[in-house]
Amino acid sequence: MDKMGRCESVPCCRVLLCYNFVTFKRIASKGLDTMLVASIENAEAHDYLTERLKKAYAFLRENDLGALSCGRHDIDGEDVFANVMEYDTVPAEAKKLEAHKLYYDVQCVAFGIERVEVAPVEGLACAKEYDEADDYALFESPMPATSVVLHAGEIAVLPPEDAHKPGCIAEDAPVHVKKVVVKVRA
């Protein structure tokens, strides 16, 4: 990590900057440049500093995430709420990508480390049709998939058009993870 709290990776000669939560909030709140990786078609559709997303960031900043009980925590009714969970990471091959239509996922690791695979929903092979009651569908993973490793205190903001596979082993062996997923109505 550099002095700005960024980790750098260079896939295919493209540098992606991943900010940890504290640094992202500091930079974004001052109006300084932050990097977002998205397709051109989807980038204009999202404002990553809307009032609802700001409520999600505030919840993550103002709470002791490690002390939160597992289950649902209401923030702003059905518009913004958090699901707290604990699990052991598994090999990526053991999971399917998931996607939502109604909510962004703001995923924050409270402790542990995990890899999250991400791919645009468009063009993915459906493994389970959309379940309207639970707002999710499952998809087969493309090869190769894009992934990011989340450490404690880091977030990934995943819009509805990005399928994602959280909970994957990040290093050599499974680890126990506690994570807060704030659901933000799109």
Region spans (language model):
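Glycine- and acidic-residue-biased ligand/ion/polar-headgroup-sensing regions
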Residues: L102-Y104, C108-V116, G123, E132-Y136
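Short, Lys/Arg-enriched N-terminal segments with co-localized hydrophobic residues
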Residues: C12-T34
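Conserved metal-binding segment of the jelly-roll/cupin
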Residues: L150-C168
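Non-DNA-binding regulatory cores of transcription-related proteins
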Residues: K128-M143
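A short, N-terminal "cap"/entry segment at the start of jelly-roll beta-barrel domains
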Residues: S29-V84, K96-A99
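Conserved short histidine dyad/triad with adjacent acidic residue
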Residues: N83-H100, I113-L124
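Methionine residue identity
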Residues: M1-M4
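A short hydrophobic beta-strand segment most commonly corresponding to one strand
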Residues: V106, I155-V157, P174-A186
